[in-house]
């Protein structure tokens, strides 16, 4: 578990504190086979699991404990020496069931950011694996972007198709992010889905121009595409992609988005 000492998995409280990391964004991911009410329940249960971690005796015994980040003051407090916080971020709009009322419900539960799609289509937009017409935001998706901005929630374009990215850029009035991505410049020989999952240079540049950030992830296929037998993708490859992103989007427009 999160407070265990077996050091299994990618993340636990002890390792976060050892590295000096104050804030952890916690993804509320919904698989594509969950839609409608099933997607809503799945995401609500996911949020409940994070709440259970924060409310647990193991967390309360820490000095200081992990806290919920619900606004700017919470974030600033968590980023001070000795502060620690969780920020909940929904990955894919399927749990909203096409309803701004559901957005309000998840906002009340502590969700403070939304990745509009996760590869597949939902009520708000088309994902990067979508087939057929190159459409982007739906009518609900456009309402959703405005509603997210009105609530001060982060808008994430990871996993979106090109039309969804263009549509969102055309109406957004606040900074946008891509929380975990590769760059299409390194995928000239990759299969279509991997190319679609990566950002073009123009897209990365446009996201950074909003005052936002493009975060490069560390998945080998996302960095360089399918590997030749026996070839490992390593730190040098990640640095090469990050350096290209900085050339395109500027140093202030690039971050790390491990996707682990």
Where are these regions (language model features)?
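N-terminal hydrophobic targeting/anchoring segments and the immediately downstream early-domain regions
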Residues: 1-133, 184-188, 194-260
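Loop-centered beta-sheet repeat module
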Residues: 133-171, 175-181
């Amino acid at each position: 578990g999160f407070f265990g000492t077996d050091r299994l998995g990618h993340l636990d409280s002890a390792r976060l504190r050892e590295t000096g990391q104050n804030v952890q964004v916690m993804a509320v991911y919904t698989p594509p086979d969950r839609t409608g009410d099933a997607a809503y329940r799945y995401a609500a249960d996911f949020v409940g699991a994070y709440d259970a971690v924060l409310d647990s005796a193991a967390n309360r015994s820490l000095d200081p404990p992990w806290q919920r980040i619900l606004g700017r003051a919470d974030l600033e407090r968590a980023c001070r020496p000795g502060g620690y916080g969780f920020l909940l971020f929904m990955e894919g709009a399927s749990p909203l069931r096409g309803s701004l009322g559901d957005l309000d419900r998840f906002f009340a539960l502590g969700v403070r950011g939304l990745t509009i799609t996760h590869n597949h289509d939902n009520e708000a937009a088309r994902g990067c694996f979508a087939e057929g017409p190159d459409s982007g935001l739906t009518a609900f998706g456009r309402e959703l972007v405005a509603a997210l901005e009105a609530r001060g929630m982060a808008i994430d374009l990871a996993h979106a198709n090109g039309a969804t990215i263009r549509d969102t850029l055309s109406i957004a009035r606040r900074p946008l992010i891509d929380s975990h991505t590769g760059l299409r410049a390194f995928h000239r020989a990759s299969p279509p889905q991997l190319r679609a999952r990566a950002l073009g240079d123009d897209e990365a540049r446009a996201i950074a121009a909003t005052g936002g950030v493009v975060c490069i992830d560390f998945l080998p296929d996302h960095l360089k595409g399918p590997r030749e037998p026996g070839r490992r993708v390593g730190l040098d490859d990640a640095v090469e992609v990050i350096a290209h992103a900085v050339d395109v989007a500027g140093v202030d427009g690039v971050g790390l988005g491990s996707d682990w």
